[in-house]
Amino acid sequence: MYNYVEQGLITIKNYDLPEKLKRNTKLHHVRKNKKKLGRSIEERPKEIDQRNEFGHWECDLVLGHKTKDDQVLLTLSERMSREFLIIKIPDKTAASVMNAFKNLRKQYSEHWNDIFKTITTDNGSEFADLANLEEVSKTLVYYAHPYTSCDKGTVERHNGLIRRFIPKGDCINNYSLQQIIDIETWCNSLPRKILAYHTPDEIFERELDKIYQTA
């Protein structure tokens, strides 16, 4: 009967019939396993999952228009305080990512090892060189399971906050550095129920004070 309808031999439409099966003729591509870049999240101490210790971060990128000349946002979230850092970088290359971390290390100088104890990120090629931090500091870098965003759910959720201001598809180039700073400030000034209605900034500054006082 469906064939008769398609050929116009019966004056009813497909949507008049109870159900018409559709066959998906698209080719299905099997994902290839990504190359393991370094230490797996499987090796990360389980205590980090409890969020009781300061200094454990998750790292990601937020893309805009996805063109070669569009800038991207490097994002980092500290797991205990939920402090969120947004760094505008020229592109999604490993070199640009590492340059951003180089500047971040200069900012926190001798306190870096206490503030950035671990970093968990994904297996994207843009983070291929991140494990090199272990050669110049005590920071340990862990790589999430491939295609498993929940391994770094904190930074993923914060990336969602960015989308309130920068919708998917918008060019990052169109947003000034001050606008990016304003977004970061808004995120870190937002009281959180999980933080007993403190803000990430309040918790982060409290932990920094502890580090600076004992240095």
Question: PLM ranges: what are they?
Answer:
Residues 1, 60, 82, 101, ...:
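Mobile genetic element proteins and their domesticated derivatives, centered on retroelements
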Residues 2-50:
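Basic, flexible linker segments flanking DNA-binding modules
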Residues 43-84:
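An active-site-proximal beta-strand-loop segment
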Residues 65, 69, 86-110:
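Active-site beta-loop-alpha junctions of metal-dependent nucleic acid enzymes
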Residues 75-77, 85-88, 118-122:
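Short, conserved beta-strand edge motifs with alternating hydrophobic and charged residues
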Residues 81-85, 110-116, 165-166:
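Short, surface-exposed connector motifs at secondary-structure boundaries
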Residues 113-129:
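Acidic/histidine-rich, metal-coordinating catalytic segments
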Residues 134-141, 145-215:
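Charged alpha-helix within mobile-element recombinases
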